[in-house]
Regions:
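Alpha-helix-loop-beta-strand connector modules within alpha/beta enzyme cores
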Residues: 1-4, 45-69, 144-147
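Glycine/proline-rich, positively charged
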Residues: 1-14, 124-125
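Active-site pocket-lining/capping segments in soluble small-molecule metabolic enzymes
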Residues: 5-10, 62-120, 137
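Active-site-adjacent beta->alpha loops and helix N-cap segments on the catalytic face
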Residues: 13-15, 35-53, 138-145
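Short, acidic/polar
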Residues: 12-24, 113-123
Length: 147
């Protein structure tokens, strides 16, 4: 299947819509986002995808949006993604919660990160049940999030 990828965040959301339109125009039937960490951002991505489908090729089948989610269970991971991976935005509330948990120990840090990630997964699934769960070969975390 012709799938494409797109950033999950941009300072100017219209650039994301233009990129989606270009991918749809070239035949993408599905667009997978970089990991999403904010429900409001997810809602915006759905709106941008809808607009891109309408403006690009209304005669074609619509390209479906698939949210990427990468569970974060460590403060260092959240900081790295936020600072060094373009197109991904980890909310400050997540970073702060993980910072506090990290000070309490590794187990607490994992627990807080897992709970944030699980809640996000459940919220995204309720909003739009097309999700790509990325776990970097951590199959247990995938199983735990899906259960």
């Amino acid at each position: 299947y012709p799938l494409a990828v797109v950033n999950s965040y941009a300072k100017n959301p219209k650039t994301l819509q233009k990129k989606m339109q270009k991918k749809i125009k070239h035949g993408a039937i599905g667009i997978i986002t970089q990991p999403v960490y904010d429900l409001e951002n997810a809602k915006l991505l759905l709106e941008l995808n809808e607009n891109a489908n309408k403006e690009c090729c209304p005669e074609q089948k619509n390209a479906k949006l698939i949210f990427g989610i990468f569970p974060i269970t460590k403060l260092r991971t959240a900081q790295f993604l936020s600072a060094h991976v373009p197109g991904i935005n980890v909310p400050n509330s997540w970073i702060e919660a993980l910072r506090v948990a990290n000070a309490r120990g590794v187990e607490e840090e994992y627990k807080v990160g897992f709970e944030l990630s699980k809640k996000l997964f459940e919220d995204l699934k309720e909003l739009h049940p097309k999700i790509h769960l990325m776990t970097a070969n951590q199959f247990k975390i995938a199983k735990d999030i899906l259960n």
